[in-house]
Amino acid sequence: MTAPRLTLPSPAKLNLMLHILGRREDGYHELQTLFQFLDYGDEITFAVRDDGVIRLHTEFDGVPHDSNLIVRAAKKLQEQSACSLGIDIWIDKILPMGGGIGGGSSNAATTLLGLNHLWRLGWDEDRLAALGLTLGADVPVFVRGHAAFAEGVGEKLTPVEPAEPWYVVLVPQVSVSTAEIFSDPLLTRNTPPIKVRPVPEGNSRNDCLPVVSRRYPEVRNALNLLGNFTEAKLTGTGSCVFGGFPSKAEADKVSALLTETLTGFVAKGSNVSMLHRKLQSLL
């Protein structure tokens, strides 16, 4: 009998805005941010094993097998659910590492949701999101799969419905260290909190942008080039830069001009992640 298999998408996210309100006693930063998904991402294939072994068959340069967030997510879920089954995992990786579009966090969330389904654990979203938070602050939004206004370190989520434009996303060929940006002495850390709900339109500033563009000329260049066509923004701590367009045709036209010299892609913004749409279709 062939082992049960499942292939799931692992979508990218954008931070449509990112405000840093202050530094907490535990060293983390208090944030307010707006998450939206892209219909673009990695693809992860899972095959159940009956011997309890967890094996990721795709190698990542410079990332030991057991340190990979996918493997850590699988092991934590296996331990906390006391599941005796194992899993073989393959990933078709297109999202950049250190790009600010949530590649690792999204992979971890897809793993938690995929294994919950294949191992028939019956965990609810709250329980999976709580486990996800122990792996990273951005994992819960991918577990929940809905565009959200996030507070705290990014884990307190309120569902929102921003517009869903087409985006041009540019991928400067640098990996930005989040820790480096958050420890920069020039980082703005005192933005007043947004208290109005829903969050007013037009709050699109990313407090990390001045520091990132100062440290990384490649990011600055991408912002300047995309900024000739639309408001160019930084997602997360970068390196990826994005801008919205009303139609795919317009986004494609700008992308064609810019990707002669830069790496990038076009994707539709989505308030319900393509991972959750796929999981719904399995029910």
Curated annotation (Swiss-Prot):
Catalyzes the phosphorylation of the position 2 hydroxy group of 4-diphosphocytidyl-2C-methyl-D-erythritol. Pathway: Isoprenoid biosynthesis; isopentenyl diphosphate biosynthesis via DXP pathway; isopentenyl diphosphate from 1-deoxy-D-xylulose 5-phosphate: step 3/6. It catalyses: 4-CDP-2-C-methyl-D-erythritol + ATP = 4-CDP-2-C-methyl-D-erythritol 2-phosphate + ADP + H(+). Coiled coil: none annotated. One of its GO terms (molecular function) is 4-(cytidine 5'-diphospho)-2-C-methyl-D-erythritol kinase activity. Its EC number is 2.7.1.148. This is 4-diphosphocytidyl-2-C-methyl-D-erythritol kinase. SUPFAM superfamilies: GHMP Kinase, C-terminal domain (SSF55060), Ribosomal protein S5 domain 2-like (SSF54211). One of its GO terms (biological process) is isopentenyl diphosphate biosynthetic process, methylerythritol 4-phosphate pathway. ATP binds at P96, M97, G98, G99, G100, I101, G102, G103, G104, S105, S106. Belongs to the GHMP kinase family. IspE subfamily. Keywords: ATP-binding, Isoprene biosynthesis, Kinase, Nucleotide-binding, Transferase. InterPro entries: GHMP_kinase_C_dom, GHMP_kinase_C_sf, GHMP_kinase_N_dom, IspE, Ribosomal_Su5_D2-typ_SF, Ribsml_uS5_D2-typ_fold_subgr. It comes from Pseudomonas fluorescens (strain Pf0-1). It is an enzyme of class 2 (transferase). The active site is at K13, D138.
